[in-house]
Amino acid sequence: MLKSRIPLAFQPETDAPYFGVHSRLGDYLNDSWRDFLGPTDPSLLLELGRQLSQKHGGLPIRVFTDSPAVFQELCPELTTGQYEISDAVSSWDALTGMARSHAFVMSNITLSWWAAFIATTYRSDPVDVLMPFPWHVTPDRADDLLPLPEWTRYERRLLPASAASNPSEE
């Protein structure tokens, strides 16, 4: 099923290699989601991407986000260095792009989980995957069930409520 829905994720790359960073903002900025899942601070995600890039020879970092304008507002450093915002327009495009990353910093959302799973299980070369911990704002027993053994956890830092405007107020 997956191969039929996102065939490019399983084909040889045609674009230059990159590291993927996924930042879920959008509805995570709303009060109803902030206390349950909460947005991870985008500057932390960029820093983790930068560390992966340095570790692996300086490949560019491609940011996948549902809120490019908010991400750029929160991370002005995005205009310098080897960063780019993905032009993926659908969830399938984003999933494909993230799964093709040579290393990947996940967000706490199932789209990220599936991209990391596909990258880890279907790529011939090992893929460094950094997974957020805890997955929810409040740690849960499920946190131990989510990662694959080869994934590395990173300690989440939540985006402060004052850092971004609530999209429903715009």
Predicted segment positions?
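Secretory-pathway luminal glycosyltransferase catalytic domains
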Residues: 1-51, 55-56, 161
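Compositionally biased, intrinsically disordered/low-complexity regions enriched for serine, proline
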Residues: 4, 14, 57, 129-131, ...
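Glycine-rich loops and low-complexity Gly/Arg-rich segments
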Residues: 44-48, 86-90, 108-111, 154-159
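Donor-binding and catalytic core of enzymes assembling or modifying cell-surface/extracellular glycoconjugates
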Residues: 53-139
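Leloir-type glycosyltransferase catalytic cores
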Residues: 137-170
